[in-house]
């Protein structure tokens, strides 16, 4: 993937940097693998806003992604590389030898015509899915299961990968993209390689409208609100916070306050927290 940098022809192109999409080989998705995608836009079942700054955006159709990779022993051929509006990684359409078609996350350097395989004993090639205990130390992996047979849950964003640091008994030590070091069961599956689109973090919208197309609404500072709307609000002109520390709109400590539960069960598997 490559990034196109725009000159300031108009205010909308100033500071714009967008994907070129030169790696895509197909523009229309596979009809059997798409579904309607009803988005809640930050509302709960009562219509109350529970997550702010969401709403609008372009209509999307959801692509069914195979995160489990449970076609064990059945070889698949990469038929096309496609765009997915629901994630910043590219997806690959796989044609299996038994006739089934599935979408997977495209690993970096996996191209049309390449062959992939899942299951124990598969070759150590990019795009193949194996149990963690069969993947060598130092390998880059993605789409990692946390619970066996549940499907990949972590390391799925564009350009991300985890690294295998050690193997000890029933657990494998991984270093995640967040620098967190975590233990995972050796029976869990993972895919070899790095997720495609490693330049996704370089994209800059250049204008507010492009961000609205993604379904993101504006964020208003608490200091410009009224005191009935935010703890930072009120005062004459540009007033200081007036509190000992920054607070959320609901009066909870903000900016640096750790929000993870102190006695969460998964703490036993985290050797070092993310930095």
Curated annotation (Swiss-Prot):
Residues 219-254 are annotated as: Disordered. GO terms for molecular function: rRNA binding; structural constituent of ribosome; transferase activity. GO terms for cellular component: chloroplast; mitochondrial large ribosomal subunit. Keywords: Chloroplast, Plastid, Ribonucleoprotein, Ribosomal protein. InterPro entries: NA-bd_OB-fold (IPR012340), Rib_uL2_dom2 (IPR014722), Ribosomal_uL2 (IPR002171), Ribosomal_uL2_bac/org-type (IPR005880), Ribosomal_uL2_C (IPR022669), Ribosomal_uL2_CS (IPR022671), Ribosomal_uL2_dom3 (IPR014726), Ribosomal_uL2_RNA-bd_dom (IPR022666). It comes from the Eukaryota. GO terms for biological process: mitochondrial translation. It is found in: Plastid, Chloroplast. The keyword Hydrolase does not apply. It holds the Pfam family Ribosomal_L2_C. NCBIfam families: rplB_bact. Part of the 50S ribosomal subunit. Belongs to the universal ribosomal protein uL2 family. This is Large ribosomal subunit protein uL2c.
């Amino acid at each position: 993937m490559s990034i196109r940098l725009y000159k300031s022809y108009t205010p909308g192109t100033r500071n714009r940097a967008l994907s070129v999409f030169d790696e895509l080989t197909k523009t229309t998705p596979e009809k059997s693998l798409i579904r309607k995608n009803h988005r809640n836009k930050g509302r709960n079942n009562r219509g109350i806003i529970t997550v702010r700054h969401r709403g609008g955006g372009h209509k999307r159709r959801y692509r069914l992604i195979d995160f489990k990779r449970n076609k064990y022993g059945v070889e698949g051929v990469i038929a096309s590389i496609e765009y997915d509006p629901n994630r910043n990684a590219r997806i690959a359409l796989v044609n299996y030898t038994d006739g089934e078609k599935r979408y997977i996350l495209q690993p970096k350097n996996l191209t049309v015509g390449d062959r992939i395989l899942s299951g124990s004993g598969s070759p150590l090639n990019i795009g193949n899915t194996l149990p963690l205990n069969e993947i060598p130390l130092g390998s880059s992996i993605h789409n990692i299961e946390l619970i066996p047979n549940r499907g990949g849950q972590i390391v799925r964003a564009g350009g991300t990968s985890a690294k295998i640091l050690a193997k000890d008994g029933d657990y494998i030590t991984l270093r995640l993209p967040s620098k967190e070091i975590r233990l995972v069961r050796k029976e869990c599956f993972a895919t070899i390689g790095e997720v495609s689109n490693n330049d996704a973090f370089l994209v800059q919208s250049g204008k507010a409208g492009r961000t609205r197309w993604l379904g993101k609404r504006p964020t208003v500072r608490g200091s410009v609100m009224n005191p009935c709307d935010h703890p930072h609000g009120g005062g004459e002109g540009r007033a200081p916070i007036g509190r000992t520390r920054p607070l959320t709109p609901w009066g909870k400590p903000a900016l640096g306050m750790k929000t993870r539960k102190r006695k969460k069960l998964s703490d036993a598997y985290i050797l070092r927290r993310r930095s």
